[in-house]
Amino acid sequence: MLEQLKLTRSQKLLHIILDPDIEELGSTIPLTGIDTYLVVLKPVKDLQALGATLAHELTHVAQFVKGTLQVTARGKRWRGKFYGLKTPYLDQPWEVQAFSKQEILFRRAIEV
């Protein structure tokens, strides 16, 4: 998946953990002070769902690395446009992109 997202040359650290207490299926947290991205996944028995969630979160890592997605104190900036904290989840363009890529990234990863 990292190759498909063109992240193989990134100098950032990627840390992936499983946390049964996380509310959502996955979350990506940029730790900008230490050039690290933390991906937290909820462990589920459905490995296909877990793989798709990982692909979704790695898409967010790619968005952060490329600078198209940035976190601010009042929301997020996507390709230069600001989106406040109250922007509905499915109206956030970075989420739309991640959902559109997650299945194909996961399917390509398991073909190898």
Describe each PLM feature range.
Residues 48, 64-96:
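Post-HEXXH active-site segment of zinc metalloproteases
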Residues 14, 18-21, 31-39:
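Juxtacatalytic substrate-recognition/specificity segment
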Residues 1-10:
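Zn2+-dependent metallopeptidase catalytic core
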